[in-house]
A protein has these predicted regions:
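Alpha-helix capping/helix-boundary segments
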Residues: 10, 43, 78, 98-99, ...
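Amphipathic alpha-helical segments within well-ordered protein domains
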Residues: 45-48, 83
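Active-site neighborhoods of divalent-metal-dependent phosphate/nucleic-acid chemistry enzymes
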Residues: 71-114
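Internal alpha/beta domain cores that form substrate/cofactor-binding pockets in large enzymes
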Residues: 61-64, 70-74, 119-128
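Short, well-structured N-terminal submotif of metal-dependent ribonuclease cores
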Residues: 1-38, 51-62, 116, 120
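Short, hinge-like loop/turn segments at secondary-structure boundaries
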Residues: 54-58, 90, 127-128
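Acidic, PIN/NYN-like endoribonuclease modules and their adjacent C-terminal/linker elements
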Residues: 1-3, 46, 100-128
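Histidine- and aromatic-rich ligand-binding microenvironments
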Residues: 6-7, 39-41, 92-93, 115, ...
């Protein structure tokens, strides 16, 4: 069983059937169905913004809950590691740094994202 940390882009794509990454996100989550899925609290929140705007927050929460993943709180260590990542990679946004720092703190086997720019940030990063 692998430990997989999910970026908000994966959940956003999963929840939106017209998102260009929807099919890739669906396939990736099916592939990792037996793995230990984690999502940082920041990415969980980010993934609910669009559904909340459309009045579908509860539907989105239920869909995410069906994936049986754990929402990981942002600890001091994760926040500090994210700050270090941002210092080294100025173009990296804080929400993205928090996902990568969470993966590092949990010793994740894989960090799954839809953002191709993350490839340069580590071996454990997989892009949809």
């Amino acid at each position: 069983v692998a430990l997989i940390v999910l970026d908000a882009s994966v959940l956003i794509a999963l929840l939106d059937p017209v998102d260009m990454l929807h099919h890739a996100a669906t396939a990736a989550l099916e592939q990792h169905a037996g793995d230990d899925l984690k999502v940082p609290a920041s990415a969980y929140s980010e993934s609910l913004v669009g559904p909340a705007k459309r009045g579908q927050a509860q539907v989105a929460k239920s869909a995410i809950a069906s994936l049986l993943m754990d929402v990981v709180p942002i600890t001091d260590r994760i926040a500090e590691d994210a700050a270090e990542l941002r210092a080294r990679h100025p173009k990296l946004r804080l929400p993205d740094a928090l996902v990568i720092a969470t993966g590092s703190a949990l010793s994740a086997d894989r960090i799954l994202t839809g953002d191709a720019a993350w490839r340069r940030l580590g071996r454990t990063i997989s892009v949809l």
